[in-house]
């Protein structure tokens, strides 16, 4: 079901500062950058081997990332796991009685459809299912 780690997402107040940090400290380059209007965030993806560091910065005060930053401050927001079939993985988790944030896969970045699983059932970790 899980095939790889797609990304580790970090919520940041200063996207440009975070990009500069990862570039200067580790030589990481931005491979993809996108504003995801429906989530109220701007992302920058920096490749690390076969995965990404996803830097998330809110563009609206009502976004979940803005609320996260207000409540918890900057830091690890979620882990994205690659799956063969996002809809099937989501249905399996729900059939086992675990909570999901999304009822069905929804648009994500890079033209994908994704689904989030509730951190209360995942030992405090927000999980994103990302198709291969």
Specify the residue positions occupied by each region the protein language model found:
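Short, structured motif recognition centered on aromatic/hydrophobic residues
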Residues: 5, 12, 22, 46, ...
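Amphipathic alpha-helical segments
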Residues: 16-29, 96
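N-terminal strand-loop-strand beta-hairpin
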Residues: 25, 30-48, 52, 118
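Short, charged/polar surface micro-motifs in flexible loops or helix N-caps
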Residues: 50-53, 60-62, 86
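N-terminal beta-strand motif that seeds the catalytic metal site of vicinal oxygen chelate
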Residues: 1-19, 74-83, 132
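A cross-kingdom feature marking solvent-exposed beta-strand/loop segments within repeated
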Residues: 4-6, 28-38, 59-77, 92, ...
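Vicinal oxygen chelate
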Residues: 44-47, 54, 81, 90-132
């Amino acid at each position: 079901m899980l095939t790889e780690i797609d990304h580790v997402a970090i919520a940041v107040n200063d996207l440009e500062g975070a990009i500069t940090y990862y570039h200067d400290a580790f030589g990481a380059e931005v491979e993809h950058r996108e504003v995801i209007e429906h989530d109220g965030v701007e992302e920058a993806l920096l490749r690390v081997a076969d995965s990404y560091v996803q830097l998330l910065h809110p563009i609206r005060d009502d976004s979940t990332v803005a609320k996260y930053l207000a409540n918890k401050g900057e830091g690890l927001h979620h882990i994205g796991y690659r799956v063969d079939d996002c809809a099937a993985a989501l249905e399996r988790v729900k059939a086992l009685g675990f909570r999901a944030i999304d009822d069905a896969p929804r648009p994500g970045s890079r033209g994908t459809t994704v689904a989030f699983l509730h951190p209360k059932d995942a030992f405090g970790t927000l999980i994103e299912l990302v198709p291969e």
